[in-house]
Amino acid sequence: MKLSMPRFDQAPVLVVGDVMLDRYWHGGTSRISPEAPVPVVKVEQIEDRPGGAANVALNIAALGAPASLVGVTGDDEAAESLANSLRGAGVRALFQRIAHQPTIVKLRVMSRHQQLLRIDFEEPFATDALALNGQVDELLEGVKVLVLSDYGKGALKNHQELIQAAKAKGIPVLADPKGKDFSIYRGASLITPNLSEFEAIVGGCADEHDLVTKGAALMADLDLGALLVTRGEHGMTLLRPGHPAMHLPARAREVFDVTGAGDTVISTLAASIAAGEELPHAVALANLAAGIVVGKLGTAAISAPELRRAIQRSEGSERGVLTIEQLLLAIDDARAHNESIVFTNGCFDILHAGHVTYLEQARAQGDRLIVAVNDDASVSRLKGPGRPINSVDRRMAVLAGLGAVDWVISFPEATPENLLAQVKPDVLVKGGDYSVDQVVGADIVSAYGGKVKVLGLVENSSTTAIVEKIRNNE
């Protein structure tokens, strides 16, 4: 399945549900309390983040999609903090504030990136807390997807009113369910329970076949358009009536914190579907997004550039022949992992042992090696008639197959100054008997603090000599 980045800027999404504030007290612990056998935390930083349905809306906005949010809060400091955070992120938030009830707050006490304690401040909302008062049609105006973010806190009581109103307008409804009664989501386009939530409804699943069978029965019973079961380290399973089950493996490189991963899944699904992606593609994108967010601390969102880089990796463009756009993203990703970038360039018309040795030496100067290749017209201008022997596509394909080479890109000019100005490598490498100040582009690289290195060439290895031997039938 080939993935591409959706046009999220044209994908308005409405989120309705339980909003809350995730508050973090970060501090250090160096002693045990004399009052009880518990650690003493000296609080050094207090951090507020949108949680629950607010985190879903935040994730949608972080991808670049227009996001609106409807929910219930108290009339207090926590509600103001939520409103300010969401406003700053570009989320249009409509809160029904109830004076006599507190905004739901999840307070986590953290030390050295470890959660020591969670304290919940919440009271169940009244049955009529989220009174839409006939505003449903107005709220759905211009929306391409509706998300019901249900945390079972009482704000979301009118599931069917919302589902039926959206269906009447042809708007897909995605629900992140809670509780032991999934009938309240009847008719939804897609629900996204995790495995424990799913098994609480259908019973334990002995294996994948059992999960698929029970999932199909649940879809039929509730008239669901689709069912996505998130399964932690086992990935996700998408079920659709009349289609085979689609199992996706987990994509996380490192799991640091699973807080809010479900929010990231449904937000990426919603934004992708709103942008016109088919459901299997949207699920694959959501799976990539989940793999990113579990590597972050606490409730977090992923950005469009992060998702774009994950798509690149999934499509195998982490190495090989790249466009300039792909290369710049790959470089950003490498630098985020503290990897240094090495750059070299040449015609590489007939690849020989000297080239291979030189490229291995160049790669040893850093973590990632870019090889920039003169295109065919450029080689012809430099080398004369009859050159190149091999087209630029063939030359780049051979270079990309070498273990020392990470990325290959072509350029049309005689020299790579324009490319160097965009790439800004940490090290510029050239082979030959030049002095450093004679290397083309050395001034560009040196100006921003990069290094320039000249490597010796392997003796008796020359493309020109090989071409002459061939022409002379030697």
From Swiss-Prot:
Biological process (GO), any one: ADP-L-glycero-beta-D-manno-heptose biosynthetic process
Catalysis: reaction(s): D-glycero-beta-D-manno-heptose 7-phosphate + ATP = D-glycero-beta-D-manno-heptose 1,7-bisphosphate + ADP + H(+); D-glycero-beta-D-manno-heptose 1-phosphate + ATP + H(+) = ADP-D-glycero-beta-D-manno-heptose + diphosphate
Binding residues for ATP: N194, L195, S196, E197
The enzyme's E.C. designation: 2.7.1.167, 2.7.7.70
Class of this enzyme: transferase
Catalytic residues in the record: D263
Keywords: ATP-binding, Carbohydrate metabolism, Kinase, Multifunctional enzyme, Nucleotide-binding, Nucleotidyltransferase, Transferase
Subunit structure: Homodimer.
Entry's family note: In the N-terminal section; belongs to the carbohydrate kinase PfkB family.
Protein name: Bifunctional protein HldE
Organism: Pseudomonas fluorescens (strain SBW25)
